[in-house]
């Protein structure tokens, strides 16, 4: 896949694909999600939940995470991105530059840097397009080189992908509901 970051449109409405022409190179692209993507994103999340359950991780997202309200809110904030191929959404992730409150306290280790960072959450794929994590990391790294992520201890696929894509294990953080997550960082 040949993807490049989308330049933000100043007066973009979240109901239009206003950055499609700027971002597309070849047939694949990463772009900001818009409200029309919500149904396809819900399908991607459903497939990701099924994959996690089949691979020994049924509890990280359960049966309903992320809720549609969170997807809608992320689109509204302009922090939800999709991987699109030939007009179909095959992956999604949340990316935001700035502090994540759940990363303020880390145990069983330490962060490598206190410099500003971008955080990636809720990476999901429908399994039809390979290389989503690589493209996600490349896209986010083009925005800010310092990245942080976390994952469930039973999400072995994501742990492998994080290490494969240059992240280092740093310790354990607690989510908003106080469940532990393995924390990773890429400088």
Residue ranges and their predicted role:
Residues 82, 88-98:
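Conserved beta-strand in the GNAT
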Residues 49-69:
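Conserved GNAT-fold acetyl-CoA-binding loop/helix
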């Amino acid at each position: 896949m040949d993807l490049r970051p989308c330049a933000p449109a100043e007066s973009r409405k979240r109901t239009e694909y206003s950055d499609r022409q700027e971002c597309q190179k070849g047939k694949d692209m990463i772009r900001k999600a818009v409200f029309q993507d919500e149904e396809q994103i819900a399908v991607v999340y459903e497939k990701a939940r099924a994959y996690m359950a089949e691979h020994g991780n049924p509890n990280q997202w359960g049966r309903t995470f992320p809720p549609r309200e969170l997807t809608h809110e992320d689109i509204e904030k302009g922090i939800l991105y999709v991987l699109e191929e030939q007009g179909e959404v095959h992956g999604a992730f949340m990316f935001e530059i700035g502090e994540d409150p759940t990363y303020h306290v880390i145990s069983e280790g330490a962060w490598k840097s206190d410099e500003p960072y971008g955080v990636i959450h809720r990476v999901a794929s429908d399994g039809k397009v390979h290389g989503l994590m690589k493209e996600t990391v490349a896209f986010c790294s083009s925005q800010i080189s310092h990245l942080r992520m976390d994952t469930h201890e039973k999400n072995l696929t994501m742990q492998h992908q994080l290490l494969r894509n240059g992240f280092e294990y740093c310790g354990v953080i607690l989510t908003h509901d106080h469940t532990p997550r393995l924390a990773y960082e890429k400088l």
